[in-house]
């Protein structure tokens, strides 16, 4: 499923991401835009460590989920990676909450660091009635 911007913002807010670990909702929506273009079915393979990034927030199989093919996965979110590809973003949000608690915070997302960090992210939730 490809979410509309405000539709995603509403879903993320409902699931408790607004202000989670100190990051406003705009940061999460911005990250999703640049990681997956709001597409829950997005996957990207990383040849270097043979891992794959999954879903709307491109959560990585080396550390966070199990896809049955990534060597030495840690599976810190204790989920199957395919659960991160569903139209319902609950699993992605729950795992993202685990990711962001690490010392890097949202810095775990390269696209966030490049495109959202230190920027005014309020336009990402503008006119969404939130």
Curated annotation (Swiss-Prot):
Residue ranges the record marks as coiled coil: none
The reaction(s) this protein catalyses: Hydrolysis of (1->4)-beta-linkages between N-acetylmuramic acid and N-acetyl-D-glucosamine residues in a peptidoglycan and between N-acetyl-D-glucosamine residues in chitodextrins
Keyword Transmembrane helix: no
Disulfide bonding pattern of the chain: 6-128, 30-116, 65-81, 77-95
EC number in record: 3.2.1.17
Xref: SUPFAM superfamilies: Lysozyme-like
Localization annotation: Secreted
Protein purpose: Lysozymes have primarily a bacteriolytic function; those in tissues and body fluids are associated with the monocyte-macrophage system and enhance the activity of immunoagents.
Family: Belongs to the glycosyl hydrolase 22 family.
Additional record remark: Lysozyme C is capable of both hydrolysis and transglycosylation; it also shows a slight esterase activity. It acts rapidly on both peptide-substituted and unsubstituted peptidoglycan, and slowly on chitin oligosaccharides.
Protein name, as recorded: Lysozyme C
Organism: Chelonia mydas (Green sea-turtle)
